Amino acid sequence: MSTVSYYTAEGLKKLKDELEQLKAIERPKASADIAEARDKGDLSENAEYDAAKEAQGLLELKIKKMEEVYSNARLIDESQLDVSKALVLSHVKIKNQSNGMEMSYHLVAESEADLKTGKISVTSPIGKGLLGKSVGEIAEITVPNGILKFEVLEITRD
């Protein structure tokens, strides 16, 4: 059973570009590697040929999985999102109630999460805890070492 995944325009383009890269460049390279290994002689004792065939099989599996993800991908219509609540694509500024530290996160789909750039998945513990919250609300988030309380200070969209 396939699962629908939601993407921003940027995330969907990145997925499509990666899929095209695999099909247009990696697939022909894998075929060329097999042909080169085949030309080296007896296939029954040719470890290079076996490795090339295995690599091709793994590549085809990856392509198939990515095609399935892409076919079930849906573009998020930002105009339909409620701007008063923390939802996917929201920029949320929060304050840790225990230490007063302020942080800003961009809530994104799981496939687009990148903590280095401040993008957290809506399926992460913090992302789940912030979903649906409004400015001024306290989000109680269960993490492995206890419960964190964050106050939502600001919600914006690009």
From Swiss-Prot:
The gene is greA. Residues 47-68 form a coiled coil. GO terms for molecular function: DNA binding; RNA polymerase binding. Belongs to the GreA/GreB family. The keyword Coiled coil applies. The keyword Repeat does not apply. Keywords: Coiled coil, DNA-binding, Transcription, Transcription regulation. This is Transcription elongation factor GreA. It comes from Flavobacterium psychrophilum (strain ATCC 49511 / DSM 21280 / CIP 103535 / JIP02/86). PROSITE patterns: GREAB_2. GO terms for biological process: DNA-templated transcription elongation; regulation of DNA-templated transcription elongation. Necessary for efficient RNA polymerase transcription elongation past template-encoded arresting sites. The arresting sites in DNA have the property of trapping a certain fraction of elongating RNA polymerases that pass through, resulting in locked ternary complexes. Cleavage of the nascent transcript by cleavage factors such as GreA or GreB allows the resumption of elongation from the new 3'terminus. GreA releases sequences of 2 to 3 nucleotides.
